[in-house]
Every structure is written in structure tokens, then in C-alpha cells.
């Protein structure tokens, strides 16, 4: 049976976990780290770098390095590199492919299936796009699971049969969620969820960048935002400062040679940022987490005093101001410190993968839809069929009728959101039910059915009860990809994987060739100038040198087959050289033996002749 993994595809970092003997294990990547930066870079030589290698070269390759792409997933955003446009799904797929590759290296077997997590407040288009990213990466996405739900699953599964209420406060690199869940007797049920898809650690970093830019401009009159390379260095320094301020009261931000002045003199940036100043310039960001928290308490109908455990998820919750706020909101309750906020979501995803593959028994995960779903009816009103925080999977139907006499068709427009006017909500998609028989208005019976699967992905059907005619739409946002596009991207990704493999093989061949050339040149020099000089004929040495030249000429070109051929030829000539050296040495030893007579050293001479004696046996 193929192995399944759990993947936390994050805005800034991603994690993969797998079940080993029923226990979840976080897999370290090829670089030895348990978290992989969600960064993809297109190097000038055509190589695609993912993770830490991509992050390391970001300063010198700003325009071709992509980060925080998760913020764009489910939209029509794209980026053009070397004349080719890439969607967020394709870029995210690169990160997923690396995680898949690292997990396969760890397990020693292929991985085909995965559970991928998304922020609880992700809309339908964002969920659909995440699933597409998995497909492009060559994964069968078993389930899309909400991040707080996965975290609660990882945290609460070993807490016994007693029913408990868990608040998950999830502040990642680019998104924020807060969820209230009940866990007991193997059932994990989400009671309510809320959040902000555009709030995360990146925003804290940008505030520090803006603060540094203002300080530098005041001192030097130069706007660093105009310099892409300087801006990238500022972002990296801001992230580092934010992390340091989680454990220190102040941090030094020192960037030498950040730019030059009008006279081409180098300028340096050197600032001290205190924790209090950092909290001051980011206080409004922190305040944005309050409303979703209050909404969850209200929607769930559970009082703050009845919350048993508070779990912090996401690296951004390490900021002291965040944990202080959570303590304040929960009436002084201390957040649980027993989980790793960076890894707990991937661990929960691996457990859910185990549930779906039958490796983990007696666990039921009941998730909810984060936003209400409905259609636009007469007057532009949003008529909700499924209210937010409804447990999924679910199916709801409602019957509508026509607004005009002899209306030949009805347009079904599907919206997601909480506003009373449909146009103020997010349009997920629309379709038409046509060829309705002529009838007075109010007579036709149009049954609209909403069906949300366990991934939170919506299917809508409209059916004319009179004729039985129906039309169905699987909600696919304007940014959604067709089946053909996904297949094309899968092939592109596979081809790129082959390219990467070929590039690695080429590098190995070149390295071996260069090493062989170096060793052979050294060997030839020793035969000409060393203590054994003159023992091998010049003809053999000349042939070896010619073969070395052929390898060097091939290395200067791009034909890897020519390099292999030249290396084989050099190998043959090197063997001939080795044989000549051996024969010369043997002849020399034999000469020494003949000249020794009946000297006492004759015993030693017999040792040299041993191979000849053994051949006779």
C-alpha cells in the first residue's frame, strides 16, 4: 500500500510528517532542517531552487525569487519568468515536490497520497487551488484539512475519553485563524472558526522594514524602497529582528554597504530596535486578531471560562505580545507549551492521512465550512442555503421559482460570505439552467442543491422539478484551472523533475571528469619528472596527454555525451599507462633479483616472485 504523508503548506515555511508505526514523525529535509522555507527561485542557469537554497540566494536574485505565494493562491495572480507565466498553484507545487522528495528519501519508498492543510478561513477557490497544486506535484490529495483542526487532532488525540474544549489560535506567516473545537472519545468536532486570510508574520516584518526605511531616509535622504536588492536585505533583517525580539528586549540591525550616496560612497544601516518600539509599530496588527476571536466565542455559544485548553499554532505566536493577548482574551488562561507551533499542523495532517488510509482507528474528524454559502435572488439579496460553521460534509436543498412570465432560463450565481447583499460577498461562480418550458412567473419549481464535500469544496446543482432537467457546477473560481491545464502543469512538473535529474547527473559526470583529469595530469608529471622518470615510453605519455586534452575540450562544451566518451577514452589510456608502469616496475625488480646472486637478501627476492609461484598452483 502506497504511503501517505501530512503536509502543512505554509506561507513562509512548510513541513511534512509521516506515520511510523502509528506514530507521527516530522521528516527532516535534505538540508537537515524540519521546516522548509516556502521559497522558489529560478536561477539564471535554468535550475529551479526550492527551500533554503532558494532563500539563501534571494538577495542576488530578487526578481526571480518567489516567496509567500500562498497569499495569492486562488486568485488570478501570476508571475512571468523567462517568457513563461507561472500560477500560484505551479509555484506551490514546486515546494510540495521538494517535501515529497525529502519524505521519499527518508522512507525509502514512493509517496503518492497526501493530506494538505489550509487556513480554516480559506474560501472555496483557495481550497480548490491548493488541491490543484498537490495534483501538479504528483500527489493524490486525499483531503484538504483546516490547519486548526489538524493542530487540535495532534494535540488532543492522546488526552483520553473526557470531552474537552480546545481553542486554537493560529497566526502563521500570511494567514490568521482562530477555532474552537470539542474533542472526546475519538471525535474531533469544530464548533466555530473565523479568521483573516491577509494577516500574518509577513505583515509584522513589513512594519519593521517601513520603520528602517523611514529611519534611513531621515538620516541619509535616500529611499531604500527604490533599490530591490537593499529591500530584500531589509526584509531578511526584519524577519531576523522579529525572531530575536521574541527572546530579547532589544536587537541590533546592522547592514553594511546597504547602498551608496550621490558620490558613490558606501552607506551603512545600523539601528537598535527595542521590543516596546516593535510592539508599538505593530499594535494595530495585533488588534486585528480580536474580532475573529470574539466571533468564534459568539458563534460557538461556548463561554470563555469553559475553554479547557489554549493551543498556539504558527511561528508568529512566539511573539510575546501575541501570547500576552491570548492570555488576556481567555481570561488569564496560560497557552499550552507542549506543542511545537511550527510542526503541530503537519503532525495532525499525518494523523488524518493515517485515518483515511486505515492506519489510525476510531478517530472521526468533523470540520466546518468557514463562511455561509448561498445564491443571489430577486433584488440582489443573498439567500443562504448553508450557514457558516455548518459541519461538513453536508448537503442542503431549497426550491426557488422564476421572477418573470415565460422565463426561458434561470441564472444561478453562487456566493460565499456573510453580507445581506449578494454583490458584497465573494462570487464563487455562476451557471445557467436553460430551456425552461413557458409558464407564468412563480409556477416553475427550481430546486437548488448545495453539496460541500469533506475538503470544503462546493458542488451546486439546479433542477427543474417539472421537466427533470438539471445542471451542475463544481465551483471553480475565475482563477481555477481546467482539467487540461492541470494535466499540462503536471507534465511540466514531471519534465522539470527529469531536467533536474539530468542536471544533477551532468554535474556528477563533469565532477568525475575534472577529478580524473587532475589525477592523470599529476600522474603523467610524476612519470616525467619524478624518481621514476624515463621508465614509461614517451609514446604512451603522449597518448594519455592527448586523451586529457580531449576531456578538457569536451568539458568546455555543452555535450555531456562527448564528455562521457572522452572520459572513457582517457580511462582506457590511463589503464595502458598503469600497465606500462607496472611492467616497468616488474622488470626493474627482476633485474635487481638477478644481480643479487646468493646474497642473504635472496629470501626477500622470493617474496616478489610469489605471484608467479601462486599462478603455478
From Swiss-Prot:
PTM sites of type Phosphothreonine: 175
Residue stretches of biased makeup (Acidic residues): 597-617
Induction notes from the record: By stress conditions e.g. heat shock.
Keyword Chaperone: yes
Source organism superkingdom: Bacteria
Keywords: ATP-binding, Chaperone, Nucleotide-binding, Phosphoprotein, Stress response
Coiled coil: none
PROSITE patterns recorded: HSP70_1, HSP70_2, HSP70_3
Family membership noted in the UniProt record: Belongs to the heat shock protein 70 family.
Main function: Acts as a chaperone.
Name this polypeptide is given: Chaperone protein DnaK
Naturally occurring in which organism (per UniProt): Rhodococcus erythropolis (strain PR4 / NBRC 100887)
Lineage of source species: Bacteria, Bacillati, Actinomycetota, Actinomycetes, Mycobacteriales
UniProt gene name: dnaK
